[in-house]
Amino acid sequence: MNPPAWPASRLFQPVDTVQTLELPRNELLETAMTNSGMQLAGGGVHRTKDIKPEDLVGRGIQLNSYQPPTTRLKPERVFQLAGGSRSSFNPSINTLLTLQPAASVPRSGGIGEVQFVHEFVPSVYFQPFSGPPGSYPDEFIYNFDVATDSIDGYA
């Protein structure tokens, strides 16, 4: 059920194209975008002249409802939405954000929580692991029988 490497064609994913956005380095505009919870992808309702929601595709990438500290914005021309480290910040550098919702290379190891819910029946094994999806083991339920919708040896 869970091989060491999942080919990209076997994963449940939307068919979308890659979009690259040039993010503004205007702090006032960024603060306004952040405070209003503007979605960079996912079809959120937000009206501006430069960025139109209908031109954006993707899932779940958005600015938080609070203003992130500038230490989480890295100057290497990569805009990190989460998990940034402390670094210097140069607001004059234009930052690019690449939206690529569909996988282009095979994934290895676990399949993540969303794909896990699609693959396994929640009534049999609803929340088998705690912690972030990256900490899941490679093999989830080695003795799960698809034909009988049960786990072998589990009463």
Swiss-Prot record:
Induction cue: Expressed in the late phase of the viral replicative cycle.
One GO term describing the cellular component: host cell nucleus
Record site feature (Cleavage), residues: 43-44, 84-85
Family annotation (InterPro entries): Adeno_PVIII
Pro-peptide region(s): 44-84
Any GO MF annotation of the entry: hexon binding
Highest rank taxon of the organism: Viruses
Keywords for the protein's UniProt record, in alphabetical order: Capsid protein, Host nucleus, Late protein, Phosphoprotein, Virion
Modification(s) after translation: Cleaved by the viral protease during virion maturation. May cause the middle segment to be shed from the capsid.
Membership in a protein family: Belongs to the adenoviridae hexon-linking protein family.
Assembly and binders: Interacts with the peripentonal hexons as well as the hexons in the facets. Part of a complex composed of the core-capsid bridging protein, the endosome lysis protein VI and the hexon-linking protein VIII; these interactions bridge the virus core to the capsid.
Note: All late proteins expressed from the major late promoter are produced by alternative splicing and alternative polyadenylation of the same gene giving rise to non-overlapping ORFs. A leader sequence is present in the N-terminus of all these mRNAs and is recognized by the viral shutoff protein to provide expression although conventional translation via ribosome scanning from the cap has been shut off in the host cell.
Protein name (record): Pre-hexon-linking protein VIII
Species whose genome carries this gene: Bovine adenovirus 2 (BAdV-2)
